[in-house]
Amino acid sequence: MPLHKYPPRIWDSLKLKQGIYARLPEHYLRTLQESHSPTPVHWKPHGVKYKVNAKTGERERVQDVPIPVYYPPESQKGLWGGEGWIQGYRYSNNDKLSARVKKVWKPQLFTRELYSEILNTKFSITVTSRTLDLIDAVYGFDYYILKTPKQDLNSKFGMDLKRAMLLRLARKDTDLYPEDPVKKEAVYSRYKVNFVIPEDEAEWVGLSLEEAAEKQRLLEKERCYVLFVACRPKLHTVLHVRPHQCVIMVEQTLL
């Protein structure tokens, strides 16, 4: 007899179909359902299912087994480029006949100042050498943040930057270089083709499920208050013109 009505592996997907989670915007729910594997950083995939044995000449089946990586909470506050901590073993005193001891390999971290052209701000960020190489490969910090998918950024700070950049582009008339129209057009024309999305969608980029649920709750509360303010004058008019009918309706409701 099963212990649960539904298997635990689908609990997260079932949670999105009820309550306030089911009322989240469609574009945000689509991003949660996208399951793309991150780019391998600490290992190299074979890329094929079979390989020929060099000694026997026979075809052998191979399998891609990723190395378990631990991402500490500090990685969410910087840009580590997908790197993390790897736990393994090493020989004591580099002697293969000695006992193995545990070892944790950690990436080398640097603190660098990176400039965002869209936000017109310098950020002091903890990065790795791989992050700097990726920024150089796409010719700029803004391009790296906007082009890199969520699973490769693997950083809450990086997704917050992406949301801020997308909102700045969506609100270009008021927020993007308001004092310099020439620079505004130059920057906007550089990013408008691939990165401009509606403001309603940009507001949800990079939000965690808890943050999105809280945002949806506040939006629904605001809509109820606006509806109450809009209907209040009409209710006052009805009560003033036909007070006896309103009293009868209230009594019927209580009964």
Residue ranges and their predicted role:
Residues 2-255:
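Compact, Lys/Arg-rich rRNA/RNP-binding cores from ribosome-related proteins
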